[in-house]
């Protein structure tokens, strides 16, 4: 099976090497298919995304994260890859992708994408060769067995659709292993040739100029009898190999782990802390997200406090990625059964809103389109420890279309204008890959970029302002996190501080729908003056007594603590 080399293409100009850019970055997840359709065929494409980079630069994001855009039969949203070296034809070509990289880099925006390392599509030439020629060069590229009785301790991830992790292949007359759908056979990482082949894929895109990868489904690369086949030492050893390739050949590029596990397990994916981390630079903090929703619904800071207290220290060169919503369902794997029932009853009253172990909604409808709550959630996302990941459309409060199947309800076209097709495409409306929302509250006539850009008080302009404030204060990106407790359980207060005398930010969040008072012990900052960051208003100087603040329902404050030398 032949594949092209990066030398066959013009490679993109790289941004200056900055080994810590990801710690300061705000990420924006955008589905190529959903953003903008440049060739009027009804689906978004790479040229369309390129034409909308000015909007993303105006909004103030630092890095675009693209889910897979590789050639695929699209039975799992592109996570079933048929050719790692080709772009899905409806999105464009590899040349289009290089043009996108160049245009993004000119605007100071980086681009990362998903790389699915665990499995391929069953239509990938490697798998077809493996089925038809067991003794050939690809015979050992996948995990084959004469029996389906191996690795019985591994859970089934897609409980809605799959009965077993083994599927019988009538051609080879053996079973093949798959942790996800049966049309996604797992690669066999015990075969050194597979490891080399996947490192070649990484090199190809890195040489073209991509800024990094989110490694999809990393815990499952290896299988061992008597284990649950997740987080195995062999998997970590392979990730160290991948990181070494990055460090040696492509410094400044980033690996982001997608490991939907508890924080104590995820920390392992940063690697050896004594070296500052020698595996992935970043990992998503999955359990934090449902607990932000629980804390606000219960009007109590404890769900957030507890999960942050259970989150171990991470290596110096590592960073969490945090998010409120993304292209999947709001995952509830990382909560207890009781908490899951609570979340379903509060946030998914219609059974069509459920998917696998989670809730299939966008941010605004999850929060009943309550502007105060949306602003509070945005403030938490931008101030809690980690690099925030925004999901396209949430900055304008897009809704979901729950009658679309599977996860498509949260993957509808970006709403640019009140015109036909939401300004997303000039195609005949019947040709669109999915219909834009026509809802009376969330439809594109009511919710769109054009209207919100022109309205100073819009959610879009609020989000842009908050991103600008965050960029001015590196405490949000790299500061330590210290929770302050306080007299009122409905209020979450914390300090982010770069160093003893560095940038210091105090964040106070009212998780209740009613106004709340809070008395905070700020003695160690006595003599400082809090300056509110959105309006630059000075608040009373901090003394030795408890500091009283009152907050409106779902209100929040971001303060910079200044002038601390002149101790009271």
Sequence positions of predicted segments:
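Active-site and adjacent substrate-binding regions of carbohydrate-active enzymes
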Residues: 1-568
């Amino acid at each position: 099976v032949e594949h092209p080399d990066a030398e066959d293409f013009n490679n993109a100009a790289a941004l200056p090497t900055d080994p810590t850019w990801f710690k300061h970055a705000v990420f924006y997840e955008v589905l190529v298919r959903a953003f903008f359709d440049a060739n009027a065929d009804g689906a978004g494409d790479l040229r369309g995304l390129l034409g909308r980079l000015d909007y993303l630069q105006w909004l103030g994001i630092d890095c675009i994260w693209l889910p897979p855009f590789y050639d695929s039969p699209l039975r799992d949203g592109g996570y079933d890859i048929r050719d790692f070296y080709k772009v899905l034809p409806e999105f464009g070509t590899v040349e289009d992708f290089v043009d996108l990289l160049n245009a993004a880099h000119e605007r100071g925006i980086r681009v990362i994408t998903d790389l699915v390392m665990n499995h391929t599509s069953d239509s990938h030439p490697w798998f077809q060769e493996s089925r038809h020629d067991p003794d050939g060069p690809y015979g050992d590229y996948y995990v084959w067995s004469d029996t389906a009785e191996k690795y019985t301790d591994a859970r089934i991830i897609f409980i809605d659709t799959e009965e077993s992790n083994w599927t019988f292949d009538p051609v080879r007359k053996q079973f093949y292993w798959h942790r996800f759908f049966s049309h996604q056979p797992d690669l066999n990482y015990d075969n050194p040739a597979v490891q080399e082949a996947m490192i070649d894929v990484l090199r190809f895109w890195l040489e073209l100029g991509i800024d990094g990868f989110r490694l999809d489904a990393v815990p499952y690369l290896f299988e061992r009898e008597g284990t649950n086949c997740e987080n195995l030492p062999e998997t970590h050893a392979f990730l160290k190999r991948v990181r070494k390739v990055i460090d040696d050949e492509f410094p400044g590029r980033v690996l982001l782990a997608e490991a939907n596990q508890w924080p104590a397990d995820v920390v392992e994916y940063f690697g050896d802390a004594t070296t500052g981390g020698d595996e992935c630079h970043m990992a998503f903090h999955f359990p934090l997200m449902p607990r932000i929703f629980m804390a606000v619904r219960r009007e109590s800071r404890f769900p957030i406090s507890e999960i942050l207290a259970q989150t171990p220290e991470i290596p110096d060169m590592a960073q969490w990625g945090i998010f409120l919503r993304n292209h999947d369902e709001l995952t509830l794997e990382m909560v207890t059964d009781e908490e899951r029932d609570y979340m379903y009853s509060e946030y998914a009253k219609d059974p069509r809103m459920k998917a696998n172990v989670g809730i299939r909604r966008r941010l605004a409808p999850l929060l009943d389109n309550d502007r105060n709550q949306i602003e509070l959630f945005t403030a938490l996302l931008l101030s809690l420890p980690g690099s925030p990941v925004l999901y396209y459309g949430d900055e304008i409060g897009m809704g979901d279309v729950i009658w679309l199947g599977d996860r498509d309800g949260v993957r509808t076209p970006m709403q640019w204008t009140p015109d036909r097709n939401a300004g997303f495409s000039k195609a005949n409306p019947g040709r669109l890959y999915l219909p834009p929302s026509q809802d009376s509250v969330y439809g594109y006539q009511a919710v769109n970029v054009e209207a919100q850009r022109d309205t100073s008080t819009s959610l879009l302009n609020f989000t842009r302002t908050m991103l600008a404030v965050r960029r001015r204060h590196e405490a949000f990106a790299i500061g330590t996190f210290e929770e302050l407790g306080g007299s009122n359980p409905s209020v979450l207060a914390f300090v982010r501080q770069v160093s003893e005398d560095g940038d210091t930010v105090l964040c106070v969040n009212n998780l209740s729908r009613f106004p709340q008072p809070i008395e905070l012990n700020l003695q160690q900052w006595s003599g400082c003056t809090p300056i509110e960051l959105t309006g630059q208003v000075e608040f009373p100087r901090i003394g030795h007594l408890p500091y009283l603040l009152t907050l409106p329902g779902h209100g929040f404050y971001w303060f910079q603590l200044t002038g601390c030398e002149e101790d009271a």
